[in-house]
A protein has these predicted regions:
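Core subunits and conserved enzymes of cellular information-processing
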Residues: 1-133
Length: 133
């Protein structure tokens, strides 16, 4: 029996961060549509090797495979920007650039979760979920 997290996205990011620091290449997290979308965007951006959903009796699980430590696509920092107690929103023109464009910001827009570059191209603002580089 697991405790319910007040911020499931922060929990997912912490699981990924802890796995990287521990030298693990696989992370398991309880399934939700938002967590799956965030993980898929990180995979699409090249920060994760694979994202799968494992069907389970009590609950489905997201299985995330992380790149080998030392590759240039390794996550150096992954930080939650918008939190339940302090939501952070930005217009398309105000979305921050991370490490001069080498990192990404995930943005939750009306068209779904996308990277900062995709949001700027689509001229969509939204809630800033996290920054990764």
């Amino acid at each position: 029996m697991s405790l319910q997290s007040t911020d499931p996205i922060a929990d997912l990011l912490t699981r990924i961060r802890n796995a990287i620091m521990a030298g693990k290449n696989e992370v398991r997290a309880p399934h939700s549509k938002m967590k799956l979308t965030v993980a898929q965007q990180l995979k699409k951006s090249g920060y994760l090797s694979d994202v799968k959903v494992e069907k389970g009796t009590p609950r489905d699980t997201i299985v995330i495979t992380i790149h080998e430590i030392g590759t240039n696509t390794t996550i150096n920092e992954i930080t939650r920007l918008s939190k339940p107690g302090r939501r952070v929103y930005a217009a398309a023109t105000d979305i921050p650039r991370i490490k001069s464009g080498r990192g990404i910001v995930l943005v939750s827009t009306s068209q779904g979760v996308m990277t900062d570059n995709e949001a700027r191209k689509a001229k969509l603002g939204g809630e800033l979920i996290c920054k990764v580089y």
